[in-house]
Structures are given as structure tokens and as C-alpha cells.
Amino acid sequence: MYEERPAGLDGAVVWTLTLTEGATARPVLPDGCMDLIWTPGRLLVAGPDTRSHLPDPIPGTRYAGVRFAPGTAPAVLGVPAHELRDLRVDLDDLWGGSRARGLTGRVDEADDPGAALEAVARAAAARARRPDPLVGDIVRRLAAGEPVAAVAAVAGLGTRHLHRRSREAFGYGPKTLARILRLQRALGLVRLGVSYAAAATRSGCADQAHLAREMRALTGMTLSDYRASAKRETPQPSGSSTTA
């Protein structure tokens, strides 16, 4: 069973998952996000994905996560996003063993691991440097389909400078982020019952064939693969949220 709710951090979500016997995990698709994840005895970080990731959760085991809004996790974790791209890393590799073990034990002992993990994330955010102030505007403009050059101009940056800032915040350049956000926008429409053809044009793709190419390039899946996975019984966290 998968559940999520808004977290007490700007744009973040707290999610919990328990996979039942016989349920099949869905592929996790890129969405520009990063996650702090707990499973009994372990805390790890899921970096920003550029391809789909198939988790291998253990039936009956509880999982909890904080999914950070695009570009906000690096300031909290103290690591540039590009260093974690397409990786799952134990938190003790980033914060040191003693600190990570203490936090893991605190979440292990909590009646509500999701709330305890959220408290860990909020405490880390309170101590962290402020996120890049341009991040939110970059995400909003790219999500709206604005060209990268226009986003750079509004931000007062050259395209190379925007690329560097984007790698640090999101894990990849603005063009890749724009493609990922466009794909997620299209799939969100599909989940609402919109046809692939209509979702493609409404999200900014030229047509359904363009959407299919983007789906294959960014996830390794076909649109038919996605339709089949979406019919599986057990929901999974979107984007970087994963269990392993």
C-alpha cells in the first residue's frame, strides 16, 4: 500500500509504502526529484534519475521517504545533485556513519516512520544553506515550456552558467530537466484519462510519435509498457522515490 501527503518543506512530499505478497513493483520514472528514504535499519538517498529504475522491495517491509521538490535537496544534503545522478547512496556515505546511524535508529524506533523521517529532513533543512534562489523560477519556466535561452535571459545568466547551476541543483542541464518535466506532464494527463495523442500535444510534444520517442529515450520504456505497468495493483512513488 502506498500513501503520500505534503511535507513541512516547500514542495516536498512524505510517502510510505508496504508491498503486499504477490504485488509487483512498478518502474520509477525520472521526475527531477531526489528522495531521502528509510527502510528498517537503513537510510539512503535516491539521486535524480535520467532513466527508469525498477525497485526490488521486500514484501511486508515498510518503507518511508521524503521526496524533495526539484532542485531543493542538494542544499539539505550538502551534495551537488550531479554527484548523485542515477545513484542510490547510503546516507552514512554523505553525512558520516555515526550521524547517519543515530538518525536511522531514531526513525526505526518511531511509531510513525514517515513523520520521523520528515523531522530529520526539516532539521537538516533548518541547518542548511539556502537553496539557490533561482531554482524555483527555473523549474516553473521550464515546466511551462519556455526555451532554455529565454529562461537563461530572464535569470540574467548565460546559457553555460545556467547549465552549471542546473547540474548542481537538478543533476543535469536545463534541456534534460525540461524534457523530464514535459514527459511527467504528459504522463500526468494520461493518468487522468487523456489519450496519448492529446497528452502529447498538450504537454508540448509535436505529436504522439514525439512523446513515444521521449518515453523511450528517458525511461527505456514504450508507451505500451507504461500502460501495462500503470495497471499493476501496487502503486509506487513517482520519480526518484524508490526502495533500493
Residue ranges and their predicted role:
Residues M1-A150, A155-T159, Y172-P174, G188-R191, ...:
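Alpha-helical bundle regulatory/interaction domains
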Residues S166-Y172, E214-T222:
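A secondary-structure capping/hinge motif
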Residues R167, A186-L189:
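Enrichment for repetitive, rod-forming helical segments
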